[in-house]
């Protein structure tokens, strides 16, 4: 199969994988007349060495290493030209995965069309992968189309796993009508009865929308079905929803019913729902009791359970208890993750102990736990809130030179602090650095900077900043305009007023 030209006919039929294919990702260009080959003294035998046969494994390996979609197609085509070679599920899967990741959707459609006439056995997982990618691109009709193609191309009835995957993607995207169509189709056309996983997705949907009563009705229907039964995931979802609606008493009762009446043992995920729920409600001591209950009943807490409790202590300002929990994690031999470290760092910074947070960052690096952008932003915010903007600027430069990935939020934290602390000269210089790196401040921040510059007697600089943002299409707020015009009029520099009017007109 070879993609040879640049225009694809969607209605064209291909009879076998030996026919030439049309590449939908090649755009038509005027073909240049090929240059004559350079003169060479090398013999024909030397210039045309025997090509090594590309096996399915080699084709898969080569395509996985190639990032460019056209390059992947070229490898796919080259393999198909070999005598006796027919592509299989593995090679098609890698090709389609690359194309859908690069949003070459026309190419994906063309290949799926060809697959209808292939004789090899395709696996359901190929279509599930396409569903996930189409869902990320908000192409929800295509998600349904991939589900329907399982029967057409793989020539098997979609499994309950396929229905669960498709339903979950549609529900998470808020596509209720498509979800309903899917369930009706599965019931009437495929004769499939919903399993626990499918029921759990429906429970999650109602909980997400705040319809807790409907969620309980789904659970009752699950019990009546005699086929599917609620599990720890079902109850965890319901309890999380109850906690979110400040119904902690009912959440605890449900937790007790799950154990005593249903005989379902809670797992670390269920316990985490309880810990997080109590922490959100400010009942951190009850959250700690849940952790103690876990240990007494042979369910060892994991990193996420400890992190949730630390976060709860931090929220109510109990930094010492958070530190004790942190030390307990280390004693158990568990390796704290980025979330755990960042949680405690944030606690230190909010308590005005940024130096302790920086020590913790050093410990984190020593333990080979990789800090993320949020971790660094916590430190920057801590330094800035303590009026240590110079150190924050130094850290920003140092981390940048070390290859640390910082986002626009990192820069905005420092600019906000400089404005709030009245360090206007530094703020203007830092604004220049940001613009050079293609990062723009938050709308409220640069408007505040303009106002502060004008109020502090730096009208000319304020005007330049305002005009600069106008030129890149950002619209100043009323306060900025008012501050600039008022300052100009006070200083009787009407030329600037006319410049502003010119900026508005243009």
UniProtKB/Swiss-Prot annotation:
InterPro entries: Pentatricopeptide_rpt, PPR_P_subfamily, TPR-like_helical_dom_sf
Region (Disordered): 28-48
PPR repeats: 88-122, 123-158, 159-194, 195-229, 231-266, 267-301, 302-336, 337-371, 372-406, 407-441, 442-476, 477-506
Pfam families with a match to the protein in the record: PPR_1, PPR_2
Keywords: Repeat
Family, per entry: Belongs to the PPR family. P subfamily.
This protein's name: Pentatricopeptide repeat-containing protein At5g18475
């Amino acid at each position: 199969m070879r993609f040879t030209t640049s225009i694809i006919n969607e209605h064209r039929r291909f009879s076998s994988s030996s026919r030439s294919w049309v590449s939908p990702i090649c755009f038509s260009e005027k073909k240049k007349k090929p240059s004559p080959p350079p003169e060479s003294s090398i013999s024909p035998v030397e210039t045309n060495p025997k090509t090594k046969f590309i096996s399915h494994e080699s084709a898969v390996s080569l395509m996985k290493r190639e990032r460019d979609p056209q390059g992947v197609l070229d490898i796919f085509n080259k393999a198909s030209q070999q005598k006796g070679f027919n592509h299989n599920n593995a090679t098609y899967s890698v090709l389609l995965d690359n194309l859908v990741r690069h949003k070459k959707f026309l190419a994906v459609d063309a290949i799926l069309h060809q697959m209808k006439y292939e004789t090899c056995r395709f696996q359901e997982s190929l279509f599930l992968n396409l569903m996930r990618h189409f869902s990320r691109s908000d192409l929800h009709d295509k998600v349904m189309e991939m589900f329907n193609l399982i029967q057409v191309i793989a020539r098997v009835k979609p499994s309950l796993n396929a229905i669960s995957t498709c339903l979950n993607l549609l529900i998470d995207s808020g596509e209720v009508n498509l979800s309903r169509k899917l369930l009706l189709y599965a019931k009437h056309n495929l004769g499939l009865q919903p399993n626990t996983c499918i029921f759990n997705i429906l429970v999650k949907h109602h909980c997400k929308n705040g319809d807790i009563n409907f969620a309980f009705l789904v659970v009752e229907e699950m019990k009546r079905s005699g086929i599917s039964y609620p599990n720890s995931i079902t109850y965890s979802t319901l309890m999380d929803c109850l906690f979110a609606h400040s119904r902690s008493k009912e959440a605890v009762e449900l937790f007790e019913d799950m154990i005593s009446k249903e005989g379902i043992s809670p797992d670390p995920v269920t316990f985490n729902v309880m810990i997080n729920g109590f922490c959100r409600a400010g009942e951190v001591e009850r959250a700690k009791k849940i952790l103690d209950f876990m240990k007494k009943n042979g369910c060892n807490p994991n990193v996420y359970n400890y992190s949730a409790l630390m976060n709860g202590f931090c929220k109510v300002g109990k930094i010492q208890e958070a530190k004790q929990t942190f030390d307990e994690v280390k004693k158990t031999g568990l390796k704290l993750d980025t979330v755990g470290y960042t949680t405690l760092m944030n606690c230190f910074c909010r308590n005005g102990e940024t130096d302790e947070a920086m020590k913790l960052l050093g410990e984190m690096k020593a333990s080979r736990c990789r800090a993320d952008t949020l971790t660094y932003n916590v430190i920057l915010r801590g330094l800035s809130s303590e009026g240590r903007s110079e150190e924050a600027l130094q850290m920003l430069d140092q981390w940048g030179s070390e290859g640390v990935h910082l986002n626009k939020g990192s820069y905005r934290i420092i600019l906000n602090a400089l404005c709030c602390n009245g360090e206007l000269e530094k703020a203007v210089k830092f604004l220049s650095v940001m613009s050079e790196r293609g990062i723009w401040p938050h709308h409220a921040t640069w408007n505040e900077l303009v106002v502060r510059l004008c109020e502090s007697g730096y009208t000319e600089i304020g005007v330049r900043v305002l005009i600069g943002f106008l030129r890149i299409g950002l619209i100043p707020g009323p306060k900025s305009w008012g501050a600039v015009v008022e300052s100009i009029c006070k200083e009787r520099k009407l030329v600037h007023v006319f410049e502003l009017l010119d900026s508005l007109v243009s």
